Amino acid sequence: MSNNWLFRNTADEKGRVIVMTPRNSEFKFMSAGRIILDHQMPKVTAQNEGSETTLLCLHGKGSVSIGGSSYELSRFDGMYIPKGMNFEVVTDQFVDIIEASCPTEKVHPVHYVNFEKDVKENADLTLHVGAEPYYRDIHKIIAENVEGSRLLMGVTMSKPGNWTSWPPHEHAATREELYLFFDIPKPGFGTQFIYSNLGSPEFCMPVNENDAVTIVKGYHPNVASPGYPINFCWALCSLEDDTWRTLGGVNVQPGFEAMPTGLR
């Protein structure tokens, strides 16, 4: 089992902290981390020279300034920041933002996504997927609604005790993926699987709130402990510009093909 697939407690530092990169994980292209600010550390600035960046506000409220414009972020709001544009994040209270980035050759427009107005009631972006015991809500925050080269970002929220990422599927030839877990109250936990062959899984570990898992190969379902949900932010990175930037197009584990993924 590889130790650089699991990153525990990604929220243990304030400021802008890039937790996983191609240098310390199995990722080929994607880097990701957290921006956590409060009244003691209310502002950070970031360079964005050769990469596109996505931001998703997990908790609190803050503002993002890009190119002379300012955008207010609260729960599940998102930002797409193009290559070559620096940005500043400011809060006067508390904000916790998940950041993902990857290199690209192309430049796309800045795009702000308001979760309540743009995503929550949009049937193309909010998907109610599966059935008991694998029911979950998928919110696509940065997806086909936003012009970009490689990155997608959103959240999956399960019912207590349910499976997600079910039926088991994989996309190793086209995309790498991050799962960052949130809102899993203690003593609840989840269990994350990654395997090409179920008889000898590459990864099978309990995961807690603020843990992150990098997925570069294999089927990757997870399950919540009874009475508790398993919720996570996901970030997908296409292995090529403008090629596999989609949530769908996955390979379902043989034997489970009759169960719809609901991914599109």
Model-assigned labels for residue ranges:
Residues 24, 31-91, 95:
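Extended, compositionally biased flexible segments
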Residues 106-131:
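A gly/proline- and charged-residue-enriched helix-loop-helix capping module
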Residues 187-264:
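Acidic/histidine-enriched, beta-strand-rich ligand/metal-binding domains
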Residues 11-44, 129-178:
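A short glycine-rich, His/Asp/Glu-containing loop-to-beta-strand
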Residues 49-67, 160, 173-211, 223:
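Glycine- and acidic-residue-biased ligand/ion/polar-headgroup-sensing regions
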Residues 43-49, 90, 165-171, 203-205, ...:
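Short histidine-centered beta-strand/loop micro-motifs
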Residues 91, 99-104, 140-143, 155-160, ...:
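Short, structured patches in soluble enzyme cores that scaffold and shape functional sites
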Residues 70-74, 83-112, 208-209, 217-243:
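Ligand-binding loop in jelly-roll beta-barrel domains
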